[in-house]
Amino acid sequence: MAITLNGSAGITTPTYGGSVSAEYITPVTGFKNRIINGDMKIDQRNGGASVTPTSGQYPIDRWQAALTQSSKYSVQQNAGSVTPPAGFTNYLGVTSLSTYTVLTGDLFDIRQKIEGFNIPDLAWGTADAQTITLSFWVRSSLTGTFGGAIKNADATRSYPFTYTISSANTWERKTITIAGDTSGTWLTDNNAGMQVGFGLGVGSTYSGTAGEWAGFNFVSATGATSVVGTNGATFYITGVQLEKGSTATSFDYRPYSTELALCQRYYQEVTWTLRTYSVNGYLYYNYCALPVTMRAIPTATTLSTAAEALVFVSAFAPVSVNSVRSGFAASGTGDAYIWERKEALSAEL
């Protein structure tokens, strides 16, 4: 009799005596990808709308824009509405808004900061540092050598890398293997442990030799193509994966609900309503658990407010990594309420 697990023969027992043989089945591993939203399908803030970012802004979830000059590029989920590579439905699209000559101290890139809790097994900063492999799909209206970098939280260690785009307006898969850094400080707590960035135009101050670890804040490799140098140039990317080992494996597809929850650890939007029979001058509060525990106690920003009645002053504040408090002081006696106030909670790295 054969026992079959997931379509593979596992343990076979003979019908009439004899020995028992066991066949080893390679275990299925999950969460090999340290990048969150690598397939660019979550965009809580902008819902697919185009953004001309300021430095530090997140055009789509977990992906941050860094820039030293404003209004040089826009970012949009699925910009240009091209067909993504097979297996993907979304991508991050950058469009240059000018013909800009990058200055020595300029930098433009799209990056993701990886929480330290997600990289302790890499053992970077020690003699046991593990090799990693970065893989992704990229498409650009430009061809040539492009660059990026991996660095630690305080940017005292960095590894510039290059890759070549051979054909314009064609999706190409790139793979870069990087020996783990045996030096520097690589945090393994709830702060940023590692940064991965893709250059869009970087001056010489922040450009270094590709393929080498350096004790400096390099954002890209020397001589890399500048996307912001050509008006209307496009740069699209998806399927970004960073994994332990020297081999690029297939993309780590995770359920939408799982990927959304991973993003909500750093940013989420909540809508709250509070309604009660009030007495003039009294305070009314409500505590609510968040759907996902956040990385740290978040900051709150009011996005929108609908109707309210008999409210003198209202308040909303996070009280922990997994709960918030909302409330108001009543301005009269009767049916008092705040209706559908929307708040953004951010605990980004």
Q: What residue ranges belong to the model's regions?
A:
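Extracellular and organelle-lumenal recognition/adhesion modules and their flexible linkers in secreted
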Residues: 4, 11-17, 22-349
